[in-house]
Each structure stands twice: as structure tokens, then as C-alpha cells.
Amino acid sequence: MRTLNVDLGERSYPIYIGENLLGDAQWFAPHIVGRRVAVISNETVAPLYLETLLGALEGREVTRVVLPDGEAYKQWETLQSIFDALLQDRHDRKTTLIALGGGVIGDMAGFAAACYQRGVNFIQVPTTLLSQVDSSVGGKTGINHPLGKNMIGAFYQPQAVVIDTASLKTLPARELSAGLAEVIKYGFICDEPFITWLEEHMDALLALEPAAVTEAIERSCAAKARVVGADERESGVRATLNLGHTFGHAIETQQGYGVWLHGEAVGAGTVMALEMSHRLGWLSAAERDRGIRLLRRAGLPVVPPADMTAEDFMEHMAVDKKVLDGRLRLVLLQGLGNAVVTGDFPREILDATLRTDYRALADQLGDE
């Protein structure tokens, strides 16, 4: 078992990483202040892991809230059903919410915790690779709006993050690949040696070899903890964590939430960020191609949806949290391992990026 710390002063909290942590009370008890707990999960995860978690909560009064599964349900009506359950069972300010599931559950349970009686404690128990390495750490919570992803929410930190790597054994291959998009991101934005490590261990990660998986999760969480500790509310360096996300969120919104998994959209969006960085002269063709090959080896799409036009992208990218004073800012790379957030680029470079033939680009790289 490994422990990391997100250093935010009095709001600091631990990240526990290990196998079979879910049923062990020692990882939960120090972070629960009252006797009332509400576990928020979904119809896919609850049958697999809820009873195990309840074993760690023995002796407490537990409300179970099981929601529909999927990005399409990350919206106001579902959030309201969490509040309904809390109020019906008379939960008070000493209640602790526990988010048992992937990124959708973590985001919604965290937002519910931020809002309920103006704030109650919550614990993240992420069960997908994507949520383990990204969304469970850092306090971003919220829901989607039909016009834009994650546009309604709050920064609200958990009391702890409990990562049980055993939960990945039931994760579909497509979800595993989606999570690897966020793992790869950390190498691209701030840790070039991690890219080399991922190239050497990608087969082991796809096979869920425990040592490789634990190492990838720990390095990813450590990178995110450093960034969040330096910039909790995304006023500066934290925005670099959104590499590929502006393009990716446009894909998710245009295609319909849940049609593309978040990590899949980020994968294709990262290819677009690599291409734009290359067009600006910040990334060599060899570096761009190296990045695309790694994403493809992870089983991720490296071509945006064929039915999305440049105009579609621009329409959806205009509704993005990184737009300031009407100016679109993007996360781009000035070399692998060095991300920047900038709105200082020629419009024609962005337009050319959106009109690139990514199918031809992928085909010219050949098969692995």
C-alpha cells in the first residue's frame, strides 16, 4: 500500500493506493466524523463492490443511493435524486458521502457534498482507471449542461481518496484505454521520462499487471497532487491538466454525452493538440508522431469523428471554461513534457488544425 498527500494546508488529504483496500475500515474510519454515511454509486458498480465497502462501514447508519450509469446522467435531475435521498433519510451536517464509482459518480457525489447543507464531508473511492488517476484527485466536482461539459460545479476537496486497484479487474477494456489517456497526459505535460516508461510498459498496463498498474497510478496521482497543491483553483498551471480537453469536450458535447467515453475524446483531442503544437513550430514531426503512436498503442482513437466539421468544433469550443474575455485559450506543448496555456496563436493555425485529415495522418504512421 502506498500513500501520497495532496498538500493544501488545512484542506490537505491522503491518497491511499493498494489492492483490496475497499473492505478495510482503517482507510475510512479516520475520515468519517459522524455515524451517518451515504454511499453514492451506480447500477454497474454497486452490484460488484457495494457490499464489500459496507463491510468497512459496519456499525454506521448507511444510506445507499444507486444511480443510473453513464455520462448522460451527469445532470441536474440525477443530482437532485441524491439530495432527495439525503433529505428523506434526514442526513445532517456530520454526514459523510462516499463516492463509489467512476468519474461521473465522483463528480456528482462531490458536488452534492459541496451543496448539501452548504457542505458536508466526502470520500472518493474511484473504481475506474480514469477516475483513479485524474477526476478523484483535486476537488473538481460538477455536472454537465446540454450546452457544455462540466459547466456547473464547484471546487470542493475530499477528505481522502481510497484507490483499490483490485477494482480494475472488472473494468471493460474500452474503459481501461480511456483511463490511459489521462495517464499518458501526465507524461506529455510535465514528465517526459514517464513517456518512455509508458512506451516500455504499455503491454503490461493493458494486461493489468499489478506492479505496472500501481506504478502508473502513483506517478499520475503524484503529478496531479503537485499541480493541485500549486494551483488549487486553476488560475495558472493547473489548466495544463486539460491537454486535449478543449477539443475533447467539443467531441463529447457534439456527439452526445456518453457516445464517446471521456478518455476517448481526450485521446483524439490530444492528437489535435499535438498537431497544432507542431504547426506552431513548437513540436517536431517526430515528437508529434511519437505521441500519436503511444495513444494508439493504448487502444485510443486518434482520429476525431468524421462527421465533425471545423465549424462544429469552434461552436462547442466557444463554451469552454478556459475562454476568458471572449478569447479561447488552449493547452499546447512546447516539446514533450512541457505544456503551456495560451491564447496567443494565429487563428489560421487553429483553423488548419481543425481541418487536418487525421485519418491520413494516422495511416501514414502505419501499424504498430
Curated annotation (Swiss-Prot):
Free-text cofactor note: Binds 1 divalent metal cation per subunit. Can use either Co(2+) or Zn(2+).
**Top-level class of the enzyme under EC nomenclature:** lyase
One Gene Ontology CC term in the entry:
cytoplasm
Its localization reads: Cytoplasm
Name the chemical reaction catalysed here.
Answer: 7-phospho-2-dehydro-3-deoxy-D-arabino-heptonate = 3-dehydroquinate + phosphate
GO molecular function: any one?
nucleotide binding
Q: Where does the UniProt entry say this protein principally localizes?
A: cytoplasm
Q: Where does NAD(+) bind?
A: 69-74, 103-107, 127-128, 140, 149
| Residues reported to bind Zn(2+) | E182, H245, H262
Pathway field: Metabolic intermediate biosynthesis; chorismate biosynthesis; chorismate from D-erythrose 4-phosphate and phosphoenolpyruvate: step 2/7
Alphabetically sorted, this entry's keywords are:
Amino-acid biosynthesis, Aromatic amino acid biosynthesis, Cobalt, Cytoplasm, Lyase, Metal-binding, NAD, Nucleotide-binding, Zinc
Q: Name one GO biological process term.
A: amino acid biosynthetic process
- Cite the Gene3D superfamilies for this sequence: 3.40.50.1970, Dehydroquinate synthase-like - alpha domain
The yes or no answer to whether the keyword Lyase is present is yes
Q: Which metal ions or organic cofactors does this protein require, according to UniProt? A: Co(2+); Zn(2+); NAD(+)
EC nos = 4.2.3.4
List the InterPro entries. Answer: Dehydroquinate_synthase, DHQ_synth_AroB, DHQ_synth_fam, DHQS/DOIS_N, DHQS_C
Q: Which family does it belong to?
A: Belongs to the sugar phosphate cyclases superfamily. Dehydroquinate synthase family.
NCBIfam families membership: aroB (TIGR01357)
**What's this chain's function?**
Catalyzes the conversion of 3-deoxy-D-arabino-heptulosonate 7-phosphate (DAHP) to dehydroquinate (DHQ).
**Could you tell me what this protein is called?**
3-dehydroquinate synthase
Task: Look up and give the organism this protein is from.
Answer: Pseudomonas paraeruginosa (strain DSM 24068 / PA7)
